[in-house]
Amino acid sequence: MNQKSTLLLTGCVLSLLTACSSEAENPACSLEHSVDEVHRVMDAWHRAASVADSSAYFGAMASDESIFIGTDETERWTTSEFKTWSRRYFQRASAWTFVPVTGERHVQTQGDVAWLDEKLDSEHMGRCRGTGILTFDHEANSWKIAHYTLSYAVPNEVADSVLQVIERWNDSK
């Protein structure tokens, strides 16, 4: 190996070693810690909705421009729009309740970005799925939800009949 290659390799190794020199400075540096923190953020977010804590619920969003996509094709909201739409729900004892199915949330991280999919149970909507993207907020030293999509989990065996119901609904409008 020539001197130039050795210097380049040494520089790369040093960069990697110092990039995440302290987990305390940046918890996103520890993969295991990051995954655990994402789980905690998501659990707290779902819990906040179930007790109608709008401050905690919307405080978990990365910004007023973060996106929430609901189950209806018209439901694509920024955080600001979603706050306005859901205000009446957060005035109740519980806005809505989605309970993550144990062992059915899968989280991946890469640097300051995390993505997940999860299965959720709900009394009013049955089994659902959620997918999300979180970003690490260095100022808040925590993960924040940048994008979340909620969808019904429709068994393939009943998909044709569900599609027929949707077609009839669309035709009636």
Predicted features and spans:
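Surface-exposed, charged secondary-structure patches
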Residues: 81-127
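Hydrophobic pocket/interface hotspot
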Residues: 45, 57-58, 65-66, 82, ...
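Short, low-complexity N-terminal intrinsically disordered segments enriched in polar/charged residues
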Residues: 20-60, 112, 162-173
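A mature extracytoplasmic/lumenal domain signature
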Residues: 61-62, 72-73, 118-122, 132, ...
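A short gly/proline-enriched turn/hairpin at secondary-structure junctions
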Residues: 66-77, 90-95
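Bacterial N-terminal signal peptides
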Residues: 9-17
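Short beta-strand edge/turn micro-motifs at domain boundaries
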Residues: 127-162
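Bacterial N-terminal signal peptides that target proteins for export
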Residues: 1-8
